[in-house]
């Protein structure tokens, strides 16, 4: 199944074989000045994808209002994008576990620095040769060298996760992502609008 829609003159294509998000206005479409008539501006919007072209005569205030209105509608959710990714999110869960393993390693390392400098030195050198990017692999290797430290890291990461899950506001995170998406798209939209200079001779 292939679905397509347009966001501010840029096509967003979805394909099961090669999903992509195309937001480059220079490659998918053009927005440029056609004429200047007094204070009104002519903006020509063309798309190389469709071969179509539309000319609008807009004032600067009108363009600004359009930009603000369009930016509120830029986030389009299509369930077909990248397949049925939301079935499991197993990779996200793995990354969360790996991150809390990394955070636990840093916490334990800091504790050892304060309380047991010799063990801190050993653990630091172990981390240099065994990066805690894969939590399970790291703890397996650490357990072969120091079961005590491995158990300490495991207990610490579980404790840290328990603290985080109580403070995590999923609604707030969702809103932050949504607001950031809109801000970035609004910023990109304003960059694609070519504003005529005020000192250009009008005809």
Swiss-Prot record:
Molecular function per GO: protein folding chaperone
Transit peptide residue numbers: 1-78
Main location (coarse class): plastid
Record-linked Pfam families: RbcX
Source taxon at top rank: Eukaryota
Similarity field: Belongs to the RbcX family.
Chain's role: Chaperone involved in RuBisCO assembly process.
Protein name from the UniProt record: Chaperonin-like RbcX protein 2, chloroplastic
Organism this protein belongs to: Arabidopsis thaliana
Organism lineage: Eukaryota, Viridiplantae, Streptophyta, Embryophyta, Tracheophyta
Gene: RBCX2
